[in-house]
Amino acid sequence: MNDFPTLQNFFSAWFHQDWEMEHDGADAVIDAWREAEDDEYVARARDELDRLLARDLDDPALGAAVRALGSEYDPTRDGSGWREWLTAVQRRLHP
């Protein structure tokens, strides 16, 4: 059973293999998703991010978890770690 259905939808639908063709960067993807979804759905994503980050996984394990949720984006290619990037996503999803 998937503990993070909202994040799975977000990562698999918005950070798919061609996401770079549709957006100028990862922040643009996050902003577009935030604007496309209602506040309640975005709040669920924030809650799921809280739970994922609370698992206290190391960076490789966080990366594996996010990839398992369907993300094709790898923040390490942009000089960031997985925890750092997920924390930035969390901040960006706040109103």
Model-identified regions with their sequence ranges:
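Amphipathic alpha-helical interaction modules
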Residues: W19-L57
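Amphipathic alpha-helical binding modules
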Residues: V66-P95
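Short terminal alpha-helical segments
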Residues: M1-A32, Q90
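Charge-rich, solvent-exposed alpha-helical interaction surfaces
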Residues: F10, V29-A32, E48, A65-L69, ...
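Charged/polar positions within long, soluble alpha-helices
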Residues: A54-D58, R91-H94
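Alpha-helix boundary/N-cap detector
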Residues: N2, E40, R44, R77-S80, ...
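A glycine-biased, small/acidic residue-tolerant capping/turn segment at secondary-structure junctions
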Residues: P60-A64
